[in-house]
Amino acid sequence: MTSQHSAKKSSKNTPKNNRTFKGFLLKFSFTALVLTIFYGGYLDWQIRSKMDGQIWHLPAEVYSRLESVKIADNLAFDEVIQILLDNEYRQTTMVAAPGDFKLEDDSIVVLRRAFPFPDKAEPQRVLRLRFSHNKLSRIEDLVTVKTVDEFRLAPKLIAMLQSDNEDRLAIPLQNYPRLLIDTLILTEDRRFYEHNGINPVGILRALIANIRAGQTVQGGSTLTQQLVKNLFLSRERTITRKANEALMSLVLDWRYDKNRILETYLNEIYLGQNGDTQIHGFELASQFYFGRSIREISLDQIALLVGMVKGPSLYNPWRNPQNALERRNIVLRLMLEHKMIGDELYQLLSQRPLGVQKKGQISRKYPAFIQTLQADLRRKLGEHKISSLLGARIFSTMDLKQQAQAENAVGNTVSQLQLKMKNPHLEGAMIITDYRTGEIRAVVGGLQTQYAGFNRALMAKRQIGSLVKPSIYLTALSNPEQFRLNTPINNQPITINVKGSPPWQPRNYDKKYSDSVMLMDALARSLNIPTVNIGMKVGLSKVIDTQKAMGWDNVEIPKVPAMLLGSYTISPYDVTKLYQTLANQGGRIALTTVDSIADRQGNLIFQHDKSAKQVVPQEAAFQTLFAMQQTVERGTARSLQKDYADLHLAGKTGTTNESRDTWFVGIDGKNISTVWLGRDDNGETKLTGASGALQIYKDYLNRTNIEKLAITPPTTVKWVGINQYGDWDCESYRTIPIWLNNGQNFCGETSSPSLTPTTETETPPQESLWDVLDNPNPPAQ
């Protein structure tokens, strides 16, 4: 009876237990479904937040200056070829890819690269350049069948800024070669266009391998999963992370089309390391390893990049060339097996070397110029706006050829002088600037041009010595009633007493003196005594006002007599500011390394203002330039005459006390070159401006094509003859420029009175430093 009763009770409980279990299962399933939906929604929000927003903190791309080929420039055949080669175009027998050109009798056919220029994007163009009598005479667009007067060349990427240790060049999918895409899919994910984000067969295969190994050793990831892992997840290998990867891949594939996923992958994938900075995306990797855009590399180079996806470090072509070669050939073999290439082409490509360039440097090649550019950005835009430049294109003013020539000139000359003078601590710096636009073409901060160290061109403040003199003479020549180029200036030793200081006794460098010397000869020979006499006569305040107007407005200039001989410190960058104004005949333009900036959409957000402000009389600047030409012709820089007499260069040497610093500023028909040579510890160089810094300038001239300095005088300046004593002589062969401020006729007259220091009967000039002297009347000479 008891047994029967228990059986009945059990049979009654079974349906109830089943109902309880089913209820629990239903609740659990519903809860799991709700949680999955919510979690899936959360993952979807995470994915959309990134994919629909700013996926990457894109670096600002810095490019070299924009260059054009113009008929108006009257370019020779060889000059055009050199321009193309300098811009990394390739001479070929068949024009097939952007960047190719070939020679045909009296013409050149070139496939010009496409590029988003600051004002507008321009597509690639097939152009024929025709020459007549060895000069460019006609440019034909072979697609539109029209002639053009000029065409622009795409600038070179020279740096990337503000990238959070990740560099990439994100480009649209349509700009990637179809062959790259097909090779990538063949190698990494053959069912990419068929699966829904994950490949179950691949995952199962990887799961079995991992279980057997007892740890995660293999992945079966699709391209979508790889993208999810790189964009959203950590690098740890756990089951939880793998589950998230799979779920997010499903969501990503459901939310976005395959092309969007593929484009993001191509721009995201990690492909190497540039120092501390990661190289992401195939476009940047192509430039990093081959020095060319992804659209211009060969099929075997595509195979190498695709092969590196599996392990950028293991297959690094510089560190592990044999591994890289084997991996590339595996990819080529896959392409052969799937009939993407034929056997003959496979044999050819698999025998090729890797074809990588010398160790890649994307963002560290021109550190001194880039440091100067970053300082420019802070001055022009302010710190708060620099962060908004992410993804922008910065078009710099750097001329790649001039930069290389300047680097080689500094490196070669300083190294030679180190050996010659047995002084291994010598250093050098150089800045080259187009004085008509204020655009800086080259910056060299020291001998180690490839390393971002101390930028002497921008940061080193050193005494300038005689470089100060042209500004003093220009101040005097701005007053033509008192000073002209042939005005005789006293050249006898003087003593000046200043309150609170020992008597100051300036001396000429060569310790030679005379009764007087013409003003222009005093500058040409860089004589100290006449310079001090002129400066004291016009007044230190006026000299300082002139210097600040010409570009030294942020320089601390001491109001003491010694400032007339450059006793204060200035950087080569600031020196260039003043000489830019002088070379531009008194027209001051702000120096810049930035020509323009465009955002990612191509909108112009900055443009350098090339307009000049006249800050000193043009007539005075013209006469000062003429006197500086005399410096080269017969003065302290006369060694230039041997090879460059026909260029009529202007220049100024500078040497400081005990030869601690040597300087030279050279002016040609287009550029100013400011050169400093010295020691970081301020030690003696045993050199002068002529034997030190000038030698760097000479080396630079030997490497480049220089325009003749042909200055057009203002209409108020006329050429008048003088004799050997400086008196007017219209029959003389020697003529000088004279400012006809009152319509004078100088023939037959004597020159201006000889200038001597102020005497007791003279009234000191207003705001002159004679006011602060113990004895306002210097000793009689």
Curated annotation (Swiss-Prot):
Per UniProt, the keywords (alphabetical) are: Antibiotic resistance, Carboxypeptidase, Cell inner membrane, Cell membrane, Cell shape, Cell wall biogenesis/degradation, Glycosyltransferase, Hydrolase, Membrane, Multifunctional enzyme, Peptidoglycan synthesis, Protease, Transferase
Q: What is its EC number?
A: 2.4.99.28, 3.4.16.4
- Regions of biased composition (Low complexity) lie at 749-768
Where does this protein act, in terms of pathway?
Answer: Cell wall biogenesis; peptidoglycan biosynthesis
Reply yes or no: does the keyword Membrane apply.
yes
**Subcellular location, record wording:** Cell inner membrane
Xref: Pfam families: Transgly, Transpeptidase, UB2H
GO BP term, example: cell wall organization
Task: Give any Gene Ontology cellular component.
Answer: peptidoglycan-based cell wall
Tell me yes or no: is Transferase among this UniProt entry's keywords.
yes
The chemistry this enzyme catalyses reads: [GlcNAc-(1->4)-Mur2Ac(oyl-L-Ala-gamma-D-Glu-L-Lys-D-Ala-D-Ala)](n)-di-trans,octa-cis-undecaprenyl diphosphate + beta-D-GlcNAc-(1->4)-Mur2Ac(oyl-L-Ala-gamma-D-Glu-L-Lys-D-Ala-D-Ala)-di-trans,octa-cis-undecaprenyl diphosphate = [GlcNAc-(1->4)-Mur2Ac(oyl-L-Ala-gamma-D-Glu-L-Lys-D-Ala-D-Ala)](n+1)-di-trans,octa-cis-undecaprenyl diphosphate + di-trans,octa-cis-undecaprenyl diphosphate + H(+); Preferential cleavage: (Ac)2-L-Lys-D-Ala-|-D-Ala. Also transpeptidation of peptidyl-alanyl moieties that are N-acyl substituents of D-alanine
Q: Where is this region: Disordered?
A: 749-781
Xref: SUPFAM superfamilies = beta-lactamase/transpeptidase-like (SSF56601), Lysozyme-like (SSF53955)
Q: Where is this region: Transglycosylase?
A: 151-322
What protein family is recorded? In the N-terminal section; belongs to the glycosyltransferase 51 family.
Name of the protein in question: Penicillin-binding protein 1B
Task: State the organism named in the record.
Answer: Haemophilus influenzae (strain ATCC 51907 / DSM 11121 / KW20 / Rd)
Q: What is the lineage of its organism?
A: Bacteria, Pseudomonadati, Pseudomonadota, Gammaproteobacteria, Pasteurellales
Tell me the gene name: mrcB
